[in-house]
Amino acid sequence: MLYLFYYCLLSPPYYFFTSHIQDFDYENKDQEELSFVSQGNRLSGTLLTPQHKTPSAVIVVIHGDGPQDRYSNGGYNPLFNTFLDANIAIFSWDKAGIGDSQGNWLHQSMEARAEEAVAALKLMQLRYPEVQVGFLGFSQAGWVIPIAASQSQPAFSVIIGGAVNWREQGQYYQKLRYEQQGKTPDEIIQLLAKEQKENDDIFGLHGTKDRTRRNDMSEDRFNFVVKNYLSDSSSYLRKMNGRILAVWGNNDLNVNAQLNACRYRAILNTHHQADIVVFPHASHGLLRVPEFNYQLESDWPIYRQLQFLWAGRKAYTEGSLPLIIDWIKNKNPDFSPYNMDCNL
C-alpha cells in the first residue's frame, strides 16, 4: 500500500512505533475472493475471516454514496480489522462499475442496491448456515438496508449515520455547507428555499426531469438523483426483519443526528429488538471529533489523513466500536448513556 510507505518515510520514529499502522493490513487474516450476480452484473468482493476460526457473526457491508471499492480506498481497513479481531467476518464488494465489478452504481435506485444486498446476504447465509449473518452500512446505506432487511431474513442490521428522508438530508447537508462558507442565517434561509423549489421542480414527483437545468451534474449523476430524490425509509423501517441497531455521531455534518434518531425511535417504537444510539463527540462515520469531522473525503487536509493513518482504529470515537461488536454478539450492551431525549 503506497500511502503506508510514504507515511513511514515521512514519520519520525516515535510516531511510527506508537502508531496503529498495522490496522491497515490484513496480516494473519484469511482473504477469499468471491463474486455473485445481481441484475445481470457480476460483482466482485472479498470475504475476510479470522484465521483458523469459525466466525461468531458475518457482516455484509453496504457502502454509502460514491464510487467505493470493497475497502473504501483503504478507509475501511481499521474498522474491518477491529471486527475481525473480535471474530466477526466481513464480506464487502466493489460497487457496480468500480474495481472488478460490472455495471454502473450511478444507474442504481435504492431498490436496486437493496436487491444486490439481499443477494450478498443469501450468499453468506448459504456459506455459514449456523452463524448469524447481517447487514452493516453507513450513510446512504440507511435507505438500502431497510429495503433489503424487509425482503430477506438478516439476523441483524446496523445502520450508521442514516437519514430517513433523502430530500431533507440534502437540505441539512447544504445548510451546514453554507455555514462553513460564512453565510448569514438570513442568506442561508433564502438560498435553501430557492434550492428546494428548484430541485422539487426538477426531481420531484411531478418534476420536469430536465437535465439542462442542472448542468453542474453529469448525465449519470443527474439520472441517479432522478431515481432516488424521493427516497424515504419510513415504510421499510417498519417492515425490517431481525435485530436493528441505528447509530449516529452527535456531531454529524452530513445528517441531522438528533432529528433522525428521534424519527427512528418513533417509527420503531413497537419493534422490541431495535436500539437507537447517538454517540457524543462522533462524526458521520463515528470518527473522533474534532480531528476527523469533515463532510467530504476531499475536505480532509493532508495532515489529518496522516493522523488517521497513525490512529488506525483509535480514530473512532471511544467506546463506539466495542459496543457495536457486543451488540452484534448478543451481549446486550448498556446503551442508556447514549439514548436521545426526544421530548425536548
At which residue positions do the language-model features occur?
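Accessory cap/linker subdomain of secreted extracellular hydrolases
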Residues: I160-K239
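Conserved alpha/beta-hydrolase
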Residues: F80-D100
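Alpha/beta-hydrolase active-site loop
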Residues: H107-R127
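Short beta-strand/loop motif that positions the catalytic acidic residue
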Residues: M240, A246-W248
